[in-house]
């Protein structure tokens, strides 16, 4: 599917269904910034790949009254890590910056990395987004023992670094009129600590307006929630995960899961959605290719 066909498909979904929100990449997993920014760091990184501007957002809103979310990837940034090596996590065994499956992580305590991301978030907000959504707002999900950080890698430092960044972002972005959300791993709804990545449910919820746990059935290990193959039980797995979060005190209004829009049939995707809606929750749906079926969604009456 080419870009024009894909965009036409999304426009059809917007006009024919009850979908009212779009999540749009502002800074991607590969470190590219997709709008014209005044950040001095981008002059060094040469990472601008301009795809849209404020006028583009206004054109989208002409389709319908859309709520627009800018997705900004935070601590996974190969361009920043390779350019400013002193801001990246170091691999002492191989004497180089740390990488995990071609992903390069910045040290979450790096002030330069934090300031850079926050400056982009403020600019995206000023351009016309309603909300800034931070993704990869975490430490690497790895037990690799040779990672070297600026600070000792323990629960307190991890959660402090994640929550302090989000708290600073929330304060700055609220002043600009934007709400703030964080994408978190689905298992964080169940795990009572931080999963080794700095995401603790009880503390992170205080630092943002919304959390979007990625409760993808395909990402749960065999046996999770009592199901040998969780991916075969989308409704039950999503429902159980969300129950864990709600039972731990997350307000319904703040719990807005990311649902699985890949590797599933239309019926399975609709089960994901039904599980969230049965708990009176708003939701987002994720497909890395931005390919969505019209039949996932509730159609508007003609």
Sequence positions of predicted segments:
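The substrate-binding groove and active-site-proximal loops of carbohydrate-active enzymes
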Residues: 1, 38-52, 101-115, 152-160, ...
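Active-site-adjacent "subsite" loops/lids of carbohydrate-active enzymes
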Residues: 1-2, 58, 75-126
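Catalytic domains of carbohydrate-active enzymes, especially glycoside hydrolases
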Residues: 6-32, 123-132, 206-210, 276-284
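Aromatic-lined carbohydrate-binding/catalytic grooves of carbohydrate-active enzymes
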Residues: 17-52, 141-143, 147-148
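Glycine-rich, aromatic-flanked loop segments that form ligand/cofactor-binding clefts
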Residues: 21-26, 49-98, 133
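Active-site-proximal loop/short-helix segments
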Residues: 31, 38, 78, 83-84, ...
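Aromatic-lined carbohydrate-recognition surfaces of secreted/lumenal glycan-active proteins
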Residues: 67-77, 133-134, 156-198, 251-264
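Substrate-binding cleft of secreted/luminal carbohydrate-active enzymes
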Residues: 208-222, 234-302
């Amino acid at each position: 599917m080419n870009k024009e066909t894909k965009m036409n498909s999304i426009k059809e979904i917007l006009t024919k269904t009850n979908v009212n929100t779009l999540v749009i990449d502002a800074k991607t997993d590969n470190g590219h910034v997709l709008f014209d920014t005044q950040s001095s760091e981008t002059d060094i990184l040469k990472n601008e790949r301009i795809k849209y501007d404020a006028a583009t957002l206004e054109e989208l809103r002409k389709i319908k009254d859309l709520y627009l979310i800018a997705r900004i990837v935070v601590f996974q940034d190969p361009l920043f890590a390779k350019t400013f090596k002193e801001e990246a996590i170091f691999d002492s065994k191989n004497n180089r910056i740390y990488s995990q499956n071609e992903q390069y992580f910045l040290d979450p305590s790096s002030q330069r990395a934090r300031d850079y991301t926050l400056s982009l978030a403020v600019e995206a907000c000023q351009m016309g987004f309603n909300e800034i959504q931070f993704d990869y707002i975490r430490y690497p999900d790895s037990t690799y023992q040779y990672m070297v950080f600026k600070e000792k890698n323990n629960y307190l430092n991890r959660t402090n670094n994640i929550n302090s960044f989000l708290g600073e972002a929330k304060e700055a972005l609220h002043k600009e009129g934007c709400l703030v959300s964080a994408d978190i791993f689905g298992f964080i709804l169940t795990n009572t600590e931080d999963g080794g990545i700095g995401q603790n449910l009880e503390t992170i919820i205080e630092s943002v307006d919304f959390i979007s746990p990625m409760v993808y059935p395909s990402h749960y290990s065999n046996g999770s929630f009592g199901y040998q193959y969780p991916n075969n039980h989308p409704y039950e797995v999503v429902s159980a995960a969300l129950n864990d979060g709600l039972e731990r005190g997350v307000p319904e209004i703040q719990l807005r899961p990311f649902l699985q829009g890949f590797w599933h049939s239309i019926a399975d995707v609709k089960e994901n959605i039904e599980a969230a809606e049965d708990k009176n929750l708003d939701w987002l749906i994720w497909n890395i290719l931005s390919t969505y079926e019209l039949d996932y969604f509730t159609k508007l009456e003609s």
